[in-house]
Amino acid sequence: RRQRQMCLRDRCGSIYSLMHRIFEGNHEPLFGRATQQIFLKPFSTITLKQILSENNPGYTSEDLLAFYAFTGGVAKYVELFVDNKALTHHKMIKLMCQENSPFLSEGKNILIEEFGKEYTIYFSILSCIANGFTARTAIESYLQREIGGYLTRLENDFNIIKKRIPMFSKAESRNVRYEIEDNFLRFWFRFFYKYIRYIEAGALEKLQEIIIRDYPTFSGHALEEYFKCRFREKGEFTALGGYWNRKGEDEIDLIALDEIEKKAVVAEIKRNRQNIKMDALMLKGASIQKELNGYSVEYRGLSMEDM
């Protein structure tokens, strides 16, 4: 009967947890009824470069990195920067720190409704992750409370964080790091939420100074994510990730595997090419030599020059 009806019903929503529950909750009336689901994704790194090139032909690699770090390719944020002609990394920071800037309250506006009355706990956890406390034990030590259930919901119900384990580890590995999925939210919790008292006091120029001061460190992580996206978009690799041992040492920024052709890329990623130490990278690679046995391994140094 359904096949005979010429009827198309679309349902869309911006609250991820609600849409997930309505269509994928086992006890919900619409469970299993959807014939197709479309998840809106950010622009690719190639598209971001095209947008920046069309609107700022003289852009630098620093501008491109900032464009990616602040937007993650999300159309709403891309549009705000383009419409305001803020397409250099300094102009982007200045725009975000202006009085009445929509960026200042964006994180709170989109997440409070998601989290409900427990939003302060979730915000504290996300702030910890954005500021480098990426292991559960480190977050719990800082917050002085157990957070296992909250991490599970942030990952599975809200799709805001993702769990990272070292390449070649078993899925049940306890050597876990957490990171915020969305680039802008990572930035928002790192700066706007952390320094919310500056915003409330109207000290936006001071906030801008802090962002400019800490931007090189913050953008280093964004550069790693940029290259992971680039490699993923190529579709040439069957597994992508990083590596670190149980002590958090021998860290490798990017490992890309083609498990069919038995090819591997092992890469060190730095903002400045002169800071890449290929000898040190190859020594780290020795710690995973067993796992790469049978692979043709290429060691690479990737920097902003390669964007």
Roles of regions detected by a PLM:
Residues 3-8:
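Short, small-residue-biased leader/transition segments that mark boundaries at the very start
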Residues 1-2, 17, 88:
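A contiguous, low-structure linker/loop signature
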Residues 37-185, 189-190:
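Interdomain hinge/linker elements that couple catalytic modules in large macromolecular machines
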Residues 35-39, 299-301:
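Conserved beta-strand scaffold positions in the cores of enzyme catalytic domains, especially
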